[in-house]
Amino acid sequence: MLPLSRVSEFVHVAEACELLGVSTEAVCRRLGQPFWHNCDPAGYAPVEHFRRFIDGAAHAASSRLFGFAIREVSRVERLAVVRLAIARSANLYQALMLACRLMEGHSNGIKYWLDEKHDAVWICRRSRRLLEAGDDMTIQYVLAGMIQVVQCGAGKAWWPKRIVLQGTGPIALPPVEASGEAAVQYHPSISAIAVPRTLLPQPVHSLDADSRTPVLAAFDEPTFLQTAPADTLVAALKQLIVTMMPHGCPSIETVAEIAGAHPRALQRSLHR
């Protein structure tokens, strides 16, 4: 299976990078990957390209907290389906449940869920792949997105007191005045934050009233989840190729590079 993420998220991140003074096209050109920010937002991009782009942009900006900076400019609520799900939730607990389902539907190979404990509910994210150099910015980006969903009910000043980050650490966090005395642990495949149960009945509100993302006339969650990335190599490659077609048919070498395979090995796989 080829892990994919929605191009719409890449577009939001690319816009945030431009606002932070980083040239999106310069980063993509340096990395030798397609300009996904110019593709159909309804299409899909490899998760690996998304990760490499954030890391490359962080190096261009010379920032150790670039993952947080991107998420602050392009808040999780700018994804219209997430914003509308939060808006229709009766309380923070319902918003967290919906957000987990929608964020999982936004990519494959990644699982989101709520882990119920006696004093807190943990928002958890599991990735099948082990971390590599440069993934710190992606983990920052993921952590900030989780926190922003909770802030819709707890207020913008809220920060988790217990955090689990994927990797072996250390991963840079905002200054102490923002993160407080949070207890941070590391796990090989999971990132998570603890939300106190006292916050769960809180009503939710938007923290991004000036979002430039247009509000959809209707929100159809089942349809959205049915269009999640394909779970087989051939189907995933079809989705990628369709996304890239407006810019010309990609070569087998380009597709193989995206899939992380040798062109001949990919051809043999497709012939089977």
Regions found by a protein language model. Give the residues of each.
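N-terminal low-complexity or simple alpha-helical regulatory segments
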Residues: 1-123, 145
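Extended mid-to-C-terminal alpha-helical interaction segments
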Residues: 169-272
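Short, solvent-exposed positions on alpha-helices
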Residues: 25-26, 137, 250
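Surface-exposed, interaction-prone regions with an acidic/low-complexity signature
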Residues: 1-12, 19, 115, 120, ...
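Short acidic/histidine-centered micro-motifs embedded in hydrophobic/aromatic stretches
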Residues: 30-34, 166, 258
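Short, well-ordered alpha-helical segments
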Residues: 11, 93, 136-144, 209, ...
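N-terminal regulatory/effector-sensing and dimerization cores
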Residues: 46, 76-199
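Hydrophobic alpha-helical core bundles mediating ligand binding, dimerization, or RNAP-core interactions
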Residues: 54, 96, 143-146, 219, ...
